[in-house]
Amino acid sequence: MGQIEWAMWANEQALASGLILITGGIVATAGRFTQWYFGAYSIVAGVFVCLLEYPRGKRKKGSTMERWGQKYMTAVVKLFGPFTRNYYVRAVLHLLLSVPAGFLLATILGTACLAIASGIYLLAAVRGEQWTPIEPKPRERPQIGGTIKQPPSNPPPRPPAEARKKPSEEEAAVAAGGPPGGPQVNPIPVTDEVV
């Protein structure tokens, strides 16, 4: 059985908790709660968490589905180097960001989600995972003539693959001396010149 990559789960959890923090902060600020400044803090912290967590990290095995527009944010996250690559730093950062938002009822759900994401990042860091960006693969140009193995022998329209089966010996003998209607021969020689 394969090994679980915890960073992938932490990334999804942290991104969702950032959105929950933003929503709770908007409710607290727009509702003019008595401690509305914690709501304003939650909006700022949620936006920061969403920007940090939007680019997915590359998986060790298999392919990673890139988020829409991720390549632009990946360049920004790469600029901070080990601060964004190391999951110990992310675990501590998310835990510290979640504490002030826990003092307000509207943002306590985002706080709990971000604390859970922090715990998952800590588990990923203990298991030796780190964030690596998804780099675009260089496109390989197909070489001209390298993809064509052998040109078709029958002129179009060609029959389907089932009908193109090799004839048995009896059918070949009948076709050789039989009535016309067999394969047509092109009277003009065709040459394939690849430049």
Curated annotation (Swiss-Prot):
Mapped to this chain, the residue ranges on the Cytoplasmic side of the membrane are: 2-7, 54-69, 81-86, 127-195
Tell me which Pfam families the record gives: Cytochrom_B558a (PF05038)
Modification after translation: Phosphorylation at Thr-147 enhances NADPH oxidase activity by promoting NCF1/p47-phox binding. Ubiquitinated at Lys-149 likely by RNF145.
**Cross-link (Glycyl lysine isopeptide (Lys-Gly) (interchain with G-Cter in ubiquitin)) at residue(s):** 149
Primary site of residence: membrane
Q: Which residues lie on this side of the membrane: Extracellular?
A: 31-35, 105
Q: What is a single molecular function from GO for this protein?
A: superoxide-generating NAD(P)H oxidase activity
The protein's location, in the record's own words, is: Cell membrane
Please give the clinical condition linked to this protein.
Answer: Granulomatous disease, chronic, autosomal recessive, 4: A form of chronic granulomatous disease, a primary immunodeficiency characterized by severe recurrent bacterial and fungal infections, along with manifestations of chronic granulomatous inflammation. It results from an impaired ability of phagocytes to mount a burst of reactive oxygen species in response to pathogens.
Oligomeric state and interaction partners are given as: Component of the phagocyte NADPH oxidase core complex/cytochrome b558 complex, composed of CYBB (heavy chain (beta)) and CYBA (light chain (alpha)). Component of the phagocyte NADPH oxidase complex composed of an obligatory core heterodimer formed by the membrane proteins CYBA and CYBB and the cytosolic regulatory subunits NCF1/p47-phox, NCF2/p67-phox, NCF4/p40-phox and the small GTPase RAC1 or RAC2. Interacts with NCF1 (via SH3 domain). Interacts with SH3PXD2A. Interacts with DUOX1, DUOX2 and TPO. Interacts with NOX4; this interaction mediates superoxide generation.
Describe the family membership recorded for this protein in Swiss-Prot or TrEMBL.
Answer: Belongs to the p22phox family.
Which purpose does this protein serve, as stated in its record?
A: Subunit of NADPH oxidase complexes that is required for the NADPH oxidase activity that generates, in various cell types, superoxide from molecular oxygen utilizing NADPH as an electron donor. Subunit of the phagocyte NADPH oxidase complex that mediates the transfer of electrons from cytosolic NADPH to O2 to produce the superoxide anion (O2(-)). In the activated complex, electrons are first transferred from NADPH to flavin adenine dinucleotide (FAD) and subsequently transferred via two heme molecules to molecular oxygen, producing superoxide through an outer-sphere reaction.
Name-wise, this protein is Cytochrome b-245 light chain
Question: What gene codes for this chain?
Answer: CYBA
